[in-house]
Amino acid sequence: METTTPQSKSSVSHRPPLGREDWWSEEATATLVEAWGNRYVKLNHGNLRQNDWKDVADAVNSRHGDNSRKKTDLQCKNRVDTLKKKYKTEKAKLSPSTWRFYNRLDVLIGPVVKKSAGGVVKSAPFKNHLNPTGSNSTGSSLEDDDEDDDEVGDWEFVARKHPRVEEVDLSEGSTCRELATAILKFGEVYERIEGKKQQMMIELEKQRMEVTKEVELKRMNMLMEMQLEIEKSKHRKRASASGKKNSH
């Protein structure tokens, strides 16, 4: 009785599916992302031209292509579009992504592109993720990416708890730092203006109280003077009346 030994999944994943000319291995995808990313940065994050895509395809074929399965510029472009869609899906997840190409695409097409003072995005070299047994994690296409993510599981999650921090130059050329500095300066100016306004209000209130006090004192003095004049007038009238009586 013959016994058959089941093939391991890793060995099968290296083989391109029959009839799949658009099949991409993990390593070919890594080379594609690096070649496309460099062109994308040199074009100041603009769209690649046809000649650029041909150069990207040449870079992939020089390392991973054979005569029967060379990648065309159109296949490279379609693959990058697929990777962008995959990135958006990973970006929308609440949990940290364990996808191999997430960090690199986040640097290239994420909401905030990290630039150095010279305006060049610093690229981080790709590293093969290791599973707990130490073997390289490989896959075929984006359909296999989800399977690979499940296989790696918590190991990659732990590995990504301490990712290598990219060096970001926060010099005068950093737009984020300039914006933060401008906001801080605006806050300081606003605080000084508000402080001066409060000081002016206090001074005006003091002046108003001084004027009110002075007016009140003048009014009381006038009333007292008027009262004295009235008393003097009454006194003169009494004296005059008593003098007339004595003369009779």
Swiss-Prot record:
Biased composition (Polar residues): 1-13, 130-141
Motif Nuclear localization signal, residue range(s) on this chain: 69-76
GO biological process entries: ethylene-activated signaling pathway; regulation of gene expression
Keywords: Coiled coil, DNA-binding, Ethylene signaling pathway, Nucleus, Transcription, Transcription regulation
Pfam family membership, one: Myb_DNA-bind_4
Disrupted gene: phenotype observed: Reduced ethylene sensitivity.
Recorded coiled-coil stretches: 190-210
MF-aspect GO terms: DNA binding
Major place of residence: nucleus
Record's keyword annotation contains Nucleotide-binding: no
GO cellular component terms given for this protein: nucleoplasm; nucleus
UniProt DNA-binding region: 24-113
Residue ranges of the region described as Disordered: 1-20, 123-150
Cellular compartments annotated: Nucleus; Nucleus, Nucleoplasm
Quaternary structure, from the entry: Interacts with the Agrobacterium tumefaciens virulence protein F (VirF) in the nucleus. Binds to EIN2 C-terminal region in the presence of ethylene.
Its biological purpose: Probable transcription regulator. Promotes histone acetylation during ethylene signaling in an EIN2-dependent manner, thus regulating positively ethylene-responsive genes.
This protein's name: Trihelix transcription factor ENAP2
UniProt organism field: Arabidopsis thaliana (Mouse-ear cress)
Gene of this entry: ENAP2
